A protein has these predicted regions:
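Generic hydrophobic-segment detector
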Residues: 13-14, 94
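Bacterial N-terminal signal peptides that target proteins for export
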Residues: 2-12
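Calycin-type beta-barrel ligand-binding domains and close structural analogs
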Residues: 25-43, 51-57, 64-204
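C-terminal motif of bacterial Sec signal peptides marking the signal peptidase cleavage site
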Residues: 20-23
Length: 204
């Protein structure tokens, strides 16, 4: 196999993954503000394996730190595997994020830095907002529901734009981090974060 074509194929698959993320989940101009996590231990470290909605995935957490404001930062790689042949990698994404706690719930604001070794274009930058359901060795990652978020933007509960030029509406939230925190303090989280992104288990 031509290695250059193989590498290009991985980049194309990574790009398609970014497009599918944008189509399935709203993005935010700002990360969520909230309280810092406590007892971090090694929650966001090591190797986690699991399933996306369309195939197997491995997430490698390679960086975690806390800044002077108490905000917890993480970074890592997401590697997609072939659905029928998990030993084959279909591409990878480098991401970073901020983790906060609101109402004893854990939230991740994640943005992509690289896909398949190429920097993410400026127009594709943005935070994907997730609710994390954490157990000792498992993690469920829930994304914003597109329809619910669009309705919230349309009635002014959240600031943002809804672009219906595509088959699936593309949503961009513009509320700042404090406004997002205030909204999440009273929101129906089960309804808002009802789109499953990944189910992961820590590799022992």
């Amino acid at each position: 196999m031509n290695l250059s074509l193989f590498g290009a194929g991985k980049i194309v698959l990574s790009i398609l993954f970014v497009f599918s993320l944008t189509a399935c989940f709203p993005t935010s101009q700002h990360p969520i503000e909230g309280n810092p996590m406590v007892n971090l231990d090694d929650t966001f470290s090591g190797i986690w394996k699991g399933e996306l909605s369309d195939g197997p995935v491995t997430i490698l957490f390679i960086q975690q730190s806390q800044d002077d404001t108490g905000t917890f930062h993480i970074g890592g790689l997401l590697v997609r595997h072939h659905e029928e042949r998990p030993s084959l990698n279909e591409g990878w994404l480098e991401f970073e994020g901020e983790v906060v706690v609101i109402r004893d719930e854990t939230f991740l604001s994640a943005q992509l830095n690289q896909m398949g070794g190429a920097p993410v274009a400026a127009e594709e930058k943005g935070y994907y907002l997730f609710r994390l359901v954490l157990e000792e060795n498992s993690m469920r990652v829930l994304g914003l529901n597109n329809l619910v978020t669009a309705e919230l933007v349309n009635r002014g509960a959240l600031e943002g734009t809804v672009n219906r030029a595509q088959t699936t509406a593309s949503i961009r939230l513009t509320s700042n981090g404090a406004a997002l925190r205030e909204f999440l303090n009273t929101a129906n989280l089960a309804e808002l974060f009802s789109s499953s992104f990944a189910q992961l288990a820590r590799r022992q």
